[in-house]
Amino acid sequence: MAELRARLERARVDEEAISRALEIVAEQGYLDDVRYARLLAADRRAIDGWGAERIRERLQHAGVERDVIDATLEAFDHSSERDAALELLRRRWPRPPESDPERQRAFGLLVRQGFESEVAYDAIREHERVVS
């Protein structure tokens, strides 16, 4: 909703019209931040391999409230985060990184995708363990 409000304000729509428009679209179920957050999180995780932190940043940028973001990301426990990081790692590196520079590149990729350092390290170690 915050994103729509910002767009209408930039278009210089008066405040009363903005409030009424937001009320109507909310009543009709066209805008639902909870649903939006869940769908974005699921899509970005499945399609792009994003971690929880990158999803959090995107939702904050879209103006989703903190409590909605927190509730959405509660589903991402350490185990599911590690599994998602491992899946991304396997797509990019079918064979585990063999040298320290390769491990650093893999680590950098995972962190840029929004995975915490601990999750990235765990995924790299697991990738090396499973293939070895």
Give residue ranges: language-model regions.
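An alpha-helical, amphipathic repeat domain used for nucleic-acid recognition
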Residues: 1-132
